[in-house]
């Protein structure tokens, strides 16, 4: 029953911008963040032996698409990630490397619209299309726009850095890179070394029951 009550408060906030004002917003954001952690633990956390996309081995795997594509969790992600980046000035669009970034960008876009903010979403392909318009970046044109690159989780920072470079090659300005879960394995350092501001909604140690990440 507590899960249901929490979700009702969260969904109320996603449709009523007036609820964002005052101390109630600060309290409810903590509730939303904890609810997101619970969803990740319940739906997306697996223990065992895994090879990550970076090639590194891990004793756990967080399959965030099980959360970001879940109809109950997506509005929560939108709210948490919006709060993470909403103070960045003059941002026009949100996107990243397909496919981990895609549902994150769309969740932010929809939540932002519900509170009167306008962010377009875009998708950075891994390879340029060879037919049609042969685009590398799908969605509204980001040429001359200020964008935030998002990712569900990052180990080395390579995926969001790749997306950022491709956005810049298209003519966009990258305001920041924001990830939902930082695995605390060097992504922050790599992204900041590459010259980008870095934001993370959660650390992997917020999710794992043990004190440090493997």
Swiss-Prot record:
Cross-referenced Pfam families: Pribosyltran
Keyword Protease: no
Keyword field: Glycosyltransferase, Magnesium, Pyrimidine biosynthesis, Transferase
Broad EC category: transferase
Residues that coordinate or bind 5-phospho-alpha-D-ribose 1-diphosphate: 125-126, 129, 131, 151-159
Functional pathway: Pyrimidine metabolism; UMP biosynthesis via de novo pathway; UMP from orotate: step 1/2
This enzyme's EC code(s): 2.4.2.10
BP terms from Gene Ontology: 'de novo' UMP biosynthetic process; pyrimidine nucleobase biosynthetic process
Residues the entry annotates as binding orotate: 155, 183
Alphabetized SUPFAM superfamilies for the sequence: PRTase-like
Catalytic reaction list: orotidine 5'-phosphate + diphosphate = orotate + 5-phospho-alpha-D-ribose 1-diphosphate
Cofactor(s) for this UniProt protein: Mg(2+)
Example GO molecular function: orotate phosphoribosyltransferase activity
Keyword Magnesium in annotation: yes
Subunit structure: Homodimer.
Function: Catalyzes the transfer of a ribosyl phosphate group from 5-phosphoribose 1-diphosphate to orotate, leading to the formation of orotidine monophosphate (OMP).
HAMAP family for this protein: PyrE
Family stated for the protein in its record: Belongs to the purine/pyrimidine phosphoribosyltransferase family. PyrE subfamily.
Name of the protein described by the UniProt record: Orotate phosphoribosyltransferase
Organism: Tropheryma whipplei (strain TW08/27)
